[in-house]
Structures are given as structure tokens and as C-alpha cells.
Amino acid sequence: MLSTKRKALDTGLQRRVRARREASEEIEESSSDSAPSETGKNDAEGGSSSDEEVDDDDDEELSESEEEASNGAASISFGALAKAQATMSKPSKRDSKNLKKSNGDGWEDNEATERKAGKKDQRDFTRSSKNAPTEVSSKKAVSRRREVVPVKKREIRDPRFEPTNGPVDMQKIEKNYDFLVDYREDEMKKLKETIRKTKDEDEKEKLKRELLRMESRKKTDARKRKAREVLDKHRKEEKELVKEGKTPYYLKKAEQKKRVLLDTFGELKGRQLDRVIERRRKKVEGKEKKNMPRARRMVD
């Protein structure tokens, strides 16, 4: 069946086609050949009749082949046609996308897809020159999420130190958590023992830094405790004076530091006091040199 169809198409393609002669050429030939011979006329008539017969035969063969092909196509079942259509290669997604881009405007297609997906506009709006204004697309997707009432971010809080519970009493807190000081002391002792037994230098340096951090924290806590004690002592004295009818005197920050230093180093004598004063002098001098401009620092 398929062979008959292919044969019909081949015969149709191989059919001889005669070119038509224009009227001007016929007139010129007739004028040039004023007296043709009878034999020439007979030959021409015979040739034209033979050509017409060949054309008629070709037309009959083509019509017969077309009828055979239509009959063969009618006899094919729908299942076979469906299978043939399924086996045909379908265009891939990439080819269809490229076809869309080539047919339509890529700029508008990108905008539509980005607007549909709710994404940011990824196009590069470059300026023609540095003096030209920057071009920005106004076709951006609007978020469906709306904040009618702004909700504050939930912060991590400790209910023990909330203002609703009243002012924080540091003395009471220190008294309640006084057992932590003993824990820290035991931990420092164990850390010192571990440093002494450790052979690895890197691990030893790490443990030493941890011990130094704990010792500095201990000194800071002791200094703060001393400052609170000095301030509490001054407040008690002022309360007694207020009972006697005198006006209260509130210490400034600088005065508080001065009293803490006097109370801390007032008991020291001789070389201990000189050593502490020299250490504090170097500390203050280092801070001043650090804050000094580089040019003046080099001159000094």
C-alpha cells in the first residue's frame, strides 16, 4: 500500500513539463518563415499531437495513483495512526522557549514571567553614558503579603530581671548566687592542675587563655563589689545626715572612682603603694599615647 503511494508520487514528480512559447516569439517566427513547406507543417502537427498524447497519459496515471493512495489511506485504522503520531518527535521545551523568544519581544516576555513568578527584575539597566539617567522598570511584582498592624519582634527576656518585678537589687542577687563563686574557684584549681599535666603546647596555651579570662573576670567582680560597698557606705552616712536636717550630697562618677581608689590603695604602704602607683601611671600613659596622632607619637 505504501509502495503504491510512493510510486504515485515518483511518477508525478517525473512527469515532463513543456514550456509555453510566448506570442511575440510565434509572431517573429511566422514573419521570418513566410513560406513553410508542407512537409514541415505535417511534422509540426505530428509532434504537437504526440506531445498532447503523452500529457494525457501522464494525467491519467497521476489520477489513478491519487485514487489508489486515497483508498490505501482510508483502509488504515485509527490505532495505527495514533501510534504513528505518538512516535513522531515532539519539540522540546528549550526549542519552544527559543521559538517564543524569536517570535515575540524577549523584554516583555521576561517582564511577564518575572511578574508571574513574583521575583525581582534581573535585567541589567545599563546607562548609555555616565551623564544619562538610570533606567528602572516600573513593572515589578507587588507582594500579596500586607502588614496592616506592625508586629514587634519577640525579644528573649529573663522574667527575673523584668521592670515589672521592681528595681534590681544587686546585693540580693549576689547573696542568692553566691555559690557560683565557689564553683568558679574549684574550676580554676582544676584548670591549673590540667595545665601543669598537659604536654601539648597548643592545648596548654588554650587552657592558659581560659584561666586568664576567669581570673580577669574575678578581679572585675571584686572591683565592682568594692565600688558598691563604697557607694552603700556613703548612702548610709547621707541618710543619717538627712535625719539630722542636712541636705543630701550625691557623689559624681569621678568622685566615686576617687573614693574607690583611696579605699583600695589606702591600706598599702611603702613599696606596695609605689608599685601600684607606677603601674597605674604606665596604664594611663599608654592610653594617652594610643589616642595621640601618629605624627606626634613619632616625634615623642
From Swiss-Prot:
InterPro entries: RRP36. Residues 1-169, 280-300 are annotated as: Disordered. It comes from the Eukaryota. Residues 112-127, 144-161, 285-300 have a biased composition (Basic and acidic residues). One of its GO terms (biological process) is maturation of SSU-rRNA from tricistronic rRNA transcript (SSU-rRNA, 5.8S rRNA, LSU-rRNA). Associates with 90S and pre-40S pre-ribosomal particles. Keywords: Coiled coil, Nucleus, Ribonucleoprotein, Ribosome biogenesis, rRNA processing. Residues 50-69 have a biased composition (Acidic residues). It comes from Botryotinia fuckeliana (strain B05.10). One of its GO terms (cellular component) is nucleolus. The keyword NAD does not apply. Component of the 90S pre-ribosome involved in the maturation of rRNAs. Required for early cleavages of the pre-RNAs in the 40S ribosomal subunit maturation pathway. Disulfide bonds: none annotated. Belongs to the RRP36 family. This is rRNA biogenesis protein rrp36. Transmembrane segments: none annotated. Residues 181-244 form a coiled coil. It is found in: Nucleus, Nucleolus.
